[in-house]
Amino acid sequence: CTITDREFSVPAMGTMAHSWVQLFPSEIEAFRAYAECYPDNCVLLVDTYNVLKSGVPNAIKVFEELDKRGYHNGGIRIDSGDIAYLSKKARKMLDEAGFTGHKIVASNSLDEYLIRDLLVQGAKLDSFGVGERLVTSKAEPVFGGVYKLTAVEEDGKIVPRIKLSELSLIHI
């Protein structure tokens, strides 16, 4: 169900990646495909394009579809932007749609200091995805390397894809 599984028959586990969302013609199609793979606990990455205008609304649509099929567990993950602010807005949107039990996960180079700051700001978060800073102290910096999908092949043509964060949209 993941890209590596589909392309190379290598089973993979983990969270939804921005490259997964970019692989599909639209965010909603990516979310639906992911929900088919992981209907029991579907956690959707909502910040590839725009958290509040498309990510969360599309996640809610997919959760409604899953709910009708008897799957009631899920959540969203926010990986960029003002996570405290976005989590509060997203929580309100999920609650208003009836998904009060769906979780909100924060990630993005988190450490104990950033997590504390998020909590002090009243972020509406249920869990934290801690990656490279889990095993490397801030005093001993880490080289943060991430995979970014730049293009996909569709009908024999290369089609560009881009991931934008909330902060990068300010500068465009």
Positions of PLM-derived features:
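Buried, small/hydrophobic-residue-enriched core segments of structured protein domains
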Residues: 1-100, 112-114, 120, 134, ...
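Generic detector of intrinsically disordered, low-complexity, polar/charged segments
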Residues: 11, 126-128, 153
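Structured core elements
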Residues: 43-45, 75-77, 103-106, 124-129, ...
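C-terminal helical cap(s) of enzyme catalytic domains, especially alpha/beta-barrels
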Residues: 119, 136-157
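Glycine-rich phosphate-binding active-site loops on the catalytic face of alpha/beta enzymes
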Residues: 124-142
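Anaerobic metallocofactor- and corrinoid-dependent redox/one-carbon enzyme cores
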Residues: 157-166
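Conserved small/polar residues in nucleotide/adenosyl-binding loops
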Residues: 170-172
